[in-house]
Amino acid sequence: MEDKAQYVFALLGILATLYFVRWSTDPLRHIPAIGPSAPIVSYLSAYRYCRNAQSILQEGYHKYKVFRVSLVDRWVVVVSGADMNEELRKVPDTHVSFQEAADDLVQLKYTIAPDVNEHPIHTPVIRGPLTRNLGALFPDVVDEINVAFPELMPAAAKRGEWVAVSVRDTMGRIVSRASNRIFVGLPLCRNPDYLKTVVEFAFSVAKSRTIINAAPAVFRPIVGHFLPWAKRAVRNAGVHVKPLIRQRVSKMQDAGDDQTDKSCDYLMWLIEEAQKTKQNLDIVVQGILVSNFAAIHTSSNSITHSLLNLAAYPQHVQPLREEIEGIIKEYGWTKEAIGKMWKLDSFMRESQRLSGISGISVMRKVLQDITLSDGTYLPKGTLVVAAAFATHTDERYYENPEVFEPFRFYDMRTENDALRKQYVNTSREFITFGHGKHACPGRFFAVNELKAMMAYIILHYDVKLEEGVSRPENVWIWHNISPASTKVLFRERQSKVQ
């Protein structure tokens, strides 16, 4: 009996020693934590963060310049305030990596596809030819919006009746149509099976990410292997996209040196980028899927937030409608016209300020040990981010920060300083899209598409919430933010401009 007791005490002593060693050698122990930080009990902090990330990030932001929060298997360091956001942006790429941070947080090799994760052919295409050619491509986006809304909105709305619409689902379908008009063109952008594949894939990434991040790192390859959505999407999308790829490549080969009739569109640019980097053309299918994830998931959430605000604050509809009507009459449905809609731009930027897609941004993984200006030491391997929502609701940067003021940014703009406050721009105080050279490259396409959709809705529909219903609170799971599942009432109206 005494021998057994000795063994038990010895085992407890060993465990206590290991516990102390792990705690004392934690390279981030010097950074204040929100919640329990000791080994094992830190899992309680991870559980709290899953359920209450918004309040935890706010608490840390107001207490510390730099703090940490717990995920299941790691600590994430968070910097607070505009100055620290700017400092994080300026750390050179030799010392930190955006891509590795995104890989860790989104688990790209499991949630999307390993090939395009390693060779992101879509990124230079989005940064380069897509953004440069937005003006030329914009009429196709507008045309698809004009076709998609009448087809996908309930028939009762067309008869002048108020009808409840599941906004996020409907907007996701319309975003997918408009985006794929650019990604793959007609007629595939209207193919129901193809659209079902890309929409389901876009929303499965968030689902997969949540499942994988809930597992300890050692089990993630196993969990990732059994998640079916990415593999299924690559297979199903390939059925539709591969024939287009083969057709384009064959046409290029037949033309030889004379490429004057070569297609000049997103799919062609992806094919050229794959060939330039000597990748198998199968990666083009993955590039199309990644582009759809970025376009559909984020954009459908963003326009849903904007519509919820439009329905919740109907007093702002008329000034928006008057602005849109006047500009469309003068400039037509052009990219130039969209750029002149300052009130609409402000409305949507303000919506994004309070309802982004994440409570964190400007994510980086430390490649070489660094020390921040406040003296905080970050060792290699640290994941560090900026507190986006807390920055956006900081009274040092925004008057009445908790209040939705749709024309906040419109009032800040002047003719000589018009660009700095527009929806697409980032700053140290506005980091929804990230900040600096690693800010979301697709935001220029997305913002023009979303503003065109909102302009169409404001001209062609009245919207409101159901009687007695106020603007629902956003849903936070970890630091990810989604609009609540709710319906908005739509009624078609006769637009004064076409």
From Swiss-Prot:
A Pfam family this chain is assigned to: p450
CDD domains attached to this UniProt entry: CYP503A1-like
Cofactor(s) needed by this chain: heme
Gene Ontology BP annotations: secondary metabolic process
Transmembrane segments: 7-24
E.C. numbers: 1.-.-.-
Positions contributing to heme binding: 440
Major subcellular location class: membrane
Record localization: Membrane
Pathway(s) per entry: Secondary metabolite biosynthesis
Sites where a glycan is attached: 425
Coiled coil: none
Bilayer disposition of the protein: Single-pass membrane protein
Cellular-component GO terms for this entry: membrane
Heme recorded as keyword: yes
Domain of life: Eukaryota
UniProt GO MF annotations: heme binding; iron ion binding; monooxygenase activity; oxidoreductase activity, acting on paired donors, with incorporation or reduction of molecular oxygen
Keyword Membrane assigned: yes
Keywords assigned by UniProt, alphabetized: Glycoprotein, Heme, Iron, Membrane, Metal-binding, Monooxygenase, Oxidoreductase, Transmembrane, Transmembrane helix
InterPro entries xref list: Cyt_P450, Cyt_P450_CS, Cyt_P450_E_grp-I, Cyt_P450_sf
Entry-linked Gene3D superfamilies: Cytochrome P450
Entry function: Cytochrome P450 monooxygenase that is able to use dehydroabietic acid and testosterone as substrates for oxidation, suggesting that the natural substrate(s) may be structurally related to steroid compounds.
Family: Belongs to the cytochrome P450 family.
Protein name per Swiss-Prot or TrEMBL: Cytochrome P450 monooxygenase 71
UniProt organism field: Postia placenta (strain ATCC 44394 / Madison 698-R) (Brown rot fungus)
